[in-house]
Amino acid sequence: MIARIWSGESPLWRLLLPLSWLYGLVSGVIRLSYQLGWQKAWRAPVPVVVVGNLTAGGNGKTPVVIWLVEQLQQRGIRVGVVSRGYGGKAERYPLVLDDRTSTALAGDEPVLIHQRTGAPVAVAPLRSDAVKALLSAHDLQMIVTDDGLQHYKLARDREIVVIDGVRRFGNGWWLPAGPMRERASRLQSVDAVIVNGGVARPGEIPMRLRPGMAVNLLTGERRDVSTFTNVVAMAGIGHPPRFFATLESCGVQPVKTVALADHQALSQADVAALVTADQTLLMTEKDAVKCRDFAAANWWYLPVDAIMADERAQRLLADLATLAQR
């Protein structure tokens, strides 16, 4: 229903317009208060790069963060990541992740980023606290913040916005009548716009998500995903249909698809009930980090990598590497 409202297919968005106007007013006043100096942002002693979005829902932001961190690491840059840690509930903040930190404490995306990149990661409701904790524990040249474009309490040196190239901005209205957190004109003030799928417009960096080999959660075995049959597909991400479409593009026709809420906590009983012994459960890598401690032999996940071959992506990386080495 929400997807139909935000896309403009359902007329119910009109009923939510008063709340959207209020949301837009409040968000605009908050940003203006920082621009005019009424509120002060905390500035880190190292450059901060924000990877965020203008809309609610999955846009492919986490794969971009992983891509960015890995590319900077290949250039010799010591980079750390901070996040709000949605879906996690630690006893105290800030929380600096280690290899044993669970998604129940830190949230699924921070754990995934840490496992994929090996980069230092910290979470806290106040992102400046997470930055301070990282810098106290590690000698870093740059901080990447996963989400937080609208978290103006943390000063930033570069802003990168990720857009779903198919859905873009839906009906264009602020939450809750539409998907917008800020007006589309905000793109004019950011340093780079990355478009996930669809068709990139002039000045935007096109990106696609390339699926890898399916990985068994229990054994680590890798297999071509197209060899699977009798598949149940599970996705607890911002936009589950994207994962299901990816499977179909790989030649997989699931007998059942299960769309879960983003950051939803998962239990062994709940997940096991989705699949029979003769079926294969295929899930996203983001879901897999929540299931590793109780995985079964027929549970697999499909990792994806962000691919950006555009020259503008290379210019962005060169700019960030130069910024980190100042």
Swiss-Prot record:
It holds the Pfam family LpxK. One of its GO terms (molecular function) is ATP binding. This is Tetraacyldisaccharide 4'-kinase. Disulfide bonds: none annotated. It catalyses: a lipid A disaccharide + ATP = a lipid IVA + ADP + H(+). The keyword Lipid metabolism applies. Pathway: Glycolipid biosynthesis; lipid IV(A) biosynthesis; lipid IV(A) from (3R)-3-hydroxytetradecanoyl-[acyl-carrier-protein] and UDP-N-acetyl-alpha-D-glucosamine: step 6/6. GO terms for cellular component: plasma membrane. Belongs to the LpxK family. Keywords: ATP-binding, Kinase, Lipid A biosynthesis, Lipid biosynthesis, Lipid metabolism, Nucleotide-binding, Transferase. InterPro entries: LpxK (IPR003758), P-loop_NTPase (IPR027417). It comes from the Bacteria. ATP binds at T55, A56, G57, G58, N59, G60, K61, T62. Transfers the gamma-phosphate of ATP to the 4'-position of a tetraacyldisaccharide 1-phosphate intermediate (termed DS-1-P) to form tetraacyldisaccharide 1,4'-bis-phosphate (lipid IVA). It is an enzyme of class 2 (transferase).
